[in-house]
């Protein structure tokens, strides 16, 4: 993950704050907008032809270690060490709008520009085709998504496109206050997406994982011939 820089009073609003990922509660319906985008204009708002932006990673969960991100360079060795196959996940950023349990928008909170939450969402890549089908029929930049959680433990959802888009209602409003709310949502979501890699898990070396598992960590060894040693000493004039 990239290192970010900041100073007192500048870009330090989220320092020390723990990001809360979106997780559904069984029996509850949510209304969400996709708020990270593939392209932005000079004004910082999503470009006309922008689509929702996603990230992806393979990871393995191991009790006592957590979620470990794997890639092509260590996949085979990590799977052997953790005795599990890696799974593919995708991530994006949602604006979860204030609603009742049935997913009906809290209009009063919406009018006040309050009650929404900007949250990263990590889901199994097996669910991505469901999102793609919804997007193909009703593009997300112009429509919201209604999601009913049928199983909070396994994060199973029934997903249906919603005809409105709450984010666009803010951005396209003639009311400058609403426009500013929309702009602030986009700006915050962009920062969250820039750091979404950390939401997938931890980047660890093989030795890091061995140490977390309480196993012996390999130590680097090297052998130097007597001729090489003499040459090194000669170079040092010893």
Label for each model-derived stretch:
Residues 95, 134, 149, 165-166:
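Generic recognition of cysteine residues
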Residues 137-157:
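Elongated alpha-helical scaffolds
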Residues 1-137, 191, 195-225, 238:
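OB-fold ssDNA-binding interfaces and closely related basic DNA-contact patches used
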Residues 121-122, 150-185, 204:
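OB-fold/S1-family single-stranded nucleic acid-binding modules
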């Amino acid at each position: 993950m990239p290192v970010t820089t900041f100073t007192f009073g500048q870009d330090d609003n989220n320092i020390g704050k723990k990001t809360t990922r979106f997780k559904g509660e069984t029996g509850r319906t949510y209304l969400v907008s996709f708020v990270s985008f593939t392209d932005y204009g000079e004004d910082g708002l999503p470009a006309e032809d922008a689509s929702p932006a996603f990230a992806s990673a393979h990871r393995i969960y191991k009790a006592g270690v957590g979620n470990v991100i794997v890639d092509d360079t260590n996949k085979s060795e990590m799977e052997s060490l953790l005795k599990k196959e890696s799974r593919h996940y995708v991530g994006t950023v949602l604006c979860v709008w204030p609603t009742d349990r049935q997913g009906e928008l809290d209009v009063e909170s919406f009018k006040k520009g309050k009650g929404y939450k900007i949250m990263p969402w990590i889901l199994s890549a097996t669910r991505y085709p469901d999102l793609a089908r919804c997007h193909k029929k009703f593009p997300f930049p112009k429509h919201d998504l209604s999601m009913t959680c049928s199983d909070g433990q396994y994060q199973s959802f029934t997903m249906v496109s919603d005809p409105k888009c709450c984010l666009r209602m803010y951005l396209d409003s003639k009311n400058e206050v609403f426009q500013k709310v929309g702009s602030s949502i986009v700006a915050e979501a962009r920062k969250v997406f820039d750091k979404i890699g950390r939401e997938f898990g931890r980047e660890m070396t093989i030795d890091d994982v061995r140490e977390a598992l309480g196993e012996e960590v390999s130590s680097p060894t090297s052998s130097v011939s007597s001729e090489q040693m003499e040459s090194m000493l000669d170079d040092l004039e010893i």
